[in-house]
Amino acid sequence: MYEKAGVALNHEPQIESFSETSPHPALGVDYGGSRIGIAATDDLGIMPHPVETIDLTHGSDGLARIRDISEMRKVKTLVVGLPLRLDGTEGDSAKKVKHYAEKLTRMLPHLTLVFVDETYSTMDASQKLHEAGKNARKQKAVIDQVAAVEILNRWMEEIA
């Protein structure tokens, strides 16, 4: 009999390597009407960092680029920001994000998809840029990436 944290187990616990059970690396996606902010965790999930902003204004839906980034970084989890209303319900923006996420899962069925409440993530990103001495209005592309970092941070706090 084995004991773990005061709980008796009738079988020897299975030991899996961290790389087999870890949801990392993960890709954070901040989907917007004209841009998508992308961020990624490192392999251990210690630190998320900005990756790029995908411009949607020229007819691209960004799906192929997200696929390429996911494959290049060997991503296991897509963390998509879901814009909920202040009362926690889903509005039109959330429905658009879910529709986009469906396309992502059809294209990348081997990845785990997770939604995270992104309420105020762009405001938080703007505040962080301001604190760093950057003019947020002049840094729209960067704001989307920092918002994606914030989405990953929230998810990492949830799974910690």
Model-derived regions: residue spans:
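Phosphate- and other anionic-substrate recognition elements at nucleic-acid/protein interfaces
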Residues: 2-27, 34-160
